């Protein structure tokens, strides 16, 4: 979701034998370029372990999203696979997603949850969500989704007023406005249950977190970099959570609430 690393277009993969013809393979058409140093290694992961197991609705949604001018904001196939498996491992049932875009990560979550599972999904743009909604409906999982259009902070504040909502969420995925990540964390830590997970996307922010101050960065990358770095520092010392920062795509930090 709201994620702005460089989109990987369809490219020609070189074969190991120089005399063999160049073969066109499927690359991550939309989404983020991997932080792996080798594009060939990333492509190997996709072709070997991700695409063969990707459900048909999740193959279709990127094709539809590719027509959108901001298609690079979508979650990638390998991250979607990672999230789906993670949800099953923790037996998640009640989840939340902040930042939906066209719904790739949302669809991955919905497919992973049991039939009576629920997702509170929030995004400021309903039009983007409507692009993927027909595919979500066709997949038979739309009934699991409670979509709210608008800023997430007022919704979170309203939830916090209800004591019954404290500790009620098994899993939260955050992939929206990076300048509000810390504001989200201050609220989500009370809404997720002890033992539950919060996943923050883009915590390596296109690798810019290690770029020198005078590095030539895109304007939006430079603007949000400081907010991402501030979040990373805060999560690293928060005693209420255990964390693991994983270099999946643009970086995902998992936070497990311990008290």
Curated annotation (Swiss-Prot):
Signal peptide: none annotated. Its EC number is 2.1.1.104. It holds the Pfam family Methyltransf_3. A divalent metal cation binds at residues 175, 201-202. Its cofactor is a divalent metal cation. Transmembrane segments: none annotated. Pathway: Aromatic compound metabolism; phenylpropanoid biosynthesis. Keywords: Lignin biosynthesis, Metal-binding, Methyltransferase, S-adenosyl-L-methionine, Transferase. GO terms for biological process: lignin biosynthetic process; methylation. The keyword Cell division does not apply. The keyword Transferase applies. Substrate binds at residues 33, 175, 206. InterPro entries: Cation-dep_OMT (IPR050362), SAM-dependent_MTases_sf (IPR029063), SAM_O-MeTrfase (IPR002935). GO terms for molecular function: caffeoyl-CoA O-methyltransferase activity; metal ion binding. It catalyses: (E)-caffeoyl-CoA + S-adenosyl-L-methionine = (E)-feruloyl-CoA + S-adenosyl-L-homocysteine + H(+). Binds 1 divalent metal cation per subunit. SUPFAM superfamilies: S-adenosyl-L-methionine-dependent methyltransferases. S-adenosyl-L-methionine binds at residues 75, 97, 99-100, 105, 123, 152, 177. Belongs to the class I-like SAM-binding methyltransferase superfamily. Cation-dependent O-methyltransferase family. CCoAMT subfamily. Methylates caffeoyl-CoA to feruloyl-CoA and 5-hydroxyferuloyl-CoA to sinapoyl-CoA. Plays a role in the synthesis of feruloylated polysaccharides. Involved in the reinforcement of the plant cell wall. Also involved in the responding to wounding or pathogen challenge by the increased formation of cell wall-bound ferulic acid polymers. This is Caffeoyl-CoA O-methyltransferase. The gene is CCOAOMT.
């Amino acid at each position: 979701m709201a994620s702005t690393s460089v989109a990987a277009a369809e490219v020609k993969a070189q074969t190991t034998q120089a005399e063999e013809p160049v073969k066109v393979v499927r690359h991550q058409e939309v989404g983020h370029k991997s932080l792996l140093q080798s594009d060939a290694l990333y492509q190997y992961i996709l072709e070997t372990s991700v695409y063969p197991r990707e459900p048909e609705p999740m193959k279709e949604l990127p094709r539809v999203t590719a027509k959108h001018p901001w298609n690079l904001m979508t979650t990638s196939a390998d991250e979607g696979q990672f999230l789906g498996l993670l949800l099953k491992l923790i037996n998640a049932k009640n989840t939340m997603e902040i930042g939906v875009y066209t719904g790739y990560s949302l669809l991955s979550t919905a497919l992973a949850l049991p039939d009576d599972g629920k997702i509170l999904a929030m995004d400021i743009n309903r039009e983007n969500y409507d692009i993927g909604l027909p595919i979500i409906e066709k997949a038979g999982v739309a009934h699991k989704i409670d979509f709210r259009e608008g800023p997430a902070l007022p919704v979170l504040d309203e939830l916090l007023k209800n004591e019954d909502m404290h500790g009620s969420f098994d899993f939260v995925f955050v992939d929206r406005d990076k300048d509000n990540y810390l504001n989200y964390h201050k609220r989500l830590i009370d809404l997720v249950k002890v033992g539950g997970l919060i996943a923050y996307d883009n915590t390596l922010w296109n690798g810019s977190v290690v770029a020198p101050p005078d590095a030539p960065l895109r304007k939006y990358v430079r603007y949000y970099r400081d907010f991402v770095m501030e979040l990373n520092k805060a999560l690293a010392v928060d005693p209420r959570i255990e964390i693991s920062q994983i270099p999946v795509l643009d970086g995902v930090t998992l936070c497990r609430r311990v008290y």
